[in-house]
């Protein structure tokens, strides 16, 4: 198939940027979703284009269903049909469950789980109608195993895994695959900015003895987006250096 458009939600963050680069290297026109009037947008686009990547911005608050629809419509009209969707948008609002504010529960579920519905709902039917598509949902090791102090985040990321399996069954005969990636600790700029002793303590829990590289997640996305991965669907691929082997 000829490469068309790949949409990456939360595409201008550390992990999102790596995913965008990996897909662009494979010849996709990559649309990086960001919030409307996102201050770093122009600088991010300029940097990516200077590095030779064919990237665009798709503005929408992914917690807003109507905004997602408008974004998808604009992308399809101005850039092309969306053949690959990577649902990567996510936030954290950590805290003990008994002390967790309802607003922090709602914010994480809305951004991390509802957004997957909001964007995918506008894209998946067209993929199925065309007989081709790739949906890649970014979950987390903590969605697989749970994590102390992250009841909201773990619930949202676990929800992504169930949604992935259900959608995969619905569209498997339509030439569309739906898979999830569950990263462990990845060396994004945000992680690398924490205190060295804290980072070292995290690394000590990982059998591989290191953090994952953002480009390792990006390259896995590129593989799942390819024709080579056409028989993989409904899968959760753990990429965590052996941190969790369930």
Give the label of every model feature segment:
Residues 12-13:
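Conserved glycine-rich cofactor-binding loop
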Residues 26-43:
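Conserved glycine-rich Rossmann-like NAD(P)H-binding loop of the short-chain dehydrogenase/reductase
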Residues 96-97, 101-109, 191, 202:
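Substrate-binding pocket helix/loop in short-chain dehydrogenase/reductase
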Residues 120, 156, 164:
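Active-site helix of classical SDR
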Residues 125, 169-173, 230:
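Alpha-helical segment proximal to the catalytic Tyr-Lys
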Residues 140:
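Residue(s) in the substrate-gating loop at a strand-loop-helix junction
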Residues 172, 177, 232-234, 240:
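Short, small/polar-rich loop/turn modules that mediate ligand/substrate recognition or access, typified
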């Amino acid at each position: 198939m000829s490469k068309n458009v790949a949409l990456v939600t939360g595409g201008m963050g550390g992990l999102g940027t790596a995913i965008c680069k990996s897909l662009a290297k494979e010849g996709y026109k990559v649309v990086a979703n960001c919030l409307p009037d996102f201050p770093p947008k122009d600088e991010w686009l300029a940097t990516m284009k200077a590095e030779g990547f064919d990237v665009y911005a798709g503005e929408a608050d992914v917690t807003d269903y109507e905004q997602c629809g408008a974004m998808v419509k604009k992308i399809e009209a101005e850039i092309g049909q969306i053949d690959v969707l990577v649902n990567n948008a996510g936030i954290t609002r950590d805290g003990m469950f008994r002390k967790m504010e309802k607003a922090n529960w709602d914010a994480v579920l809305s951004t991390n789980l509802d957004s997957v519905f909001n964007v995918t709902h506008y894209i998946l039917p067209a993929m199925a109608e065309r007989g081709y598509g790739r949906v890649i949902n970014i979950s987390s090791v903590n969605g697989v195993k749970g994590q102390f102090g992250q009841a909201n985040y773990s619930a949202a990321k676990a929800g992504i895994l169930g949604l992935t399996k259900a959608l995969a069954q619905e569209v498997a005969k339509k030439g569309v695959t739906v898979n999830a990636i569950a990263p462990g600790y990845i060396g994004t700029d945000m992680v690398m900015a924490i205190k060295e002793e804290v980072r070292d303590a995290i690394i000590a829990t990982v059998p591989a003895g290191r953090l994952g590289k953002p480009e390792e997640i990006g390259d896995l996305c590129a593989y799942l987006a390819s024709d080579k991965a056409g028989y993989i669907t409904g899968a959760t691929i753990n990429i965590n250096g052996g941190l969790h082997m369930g």
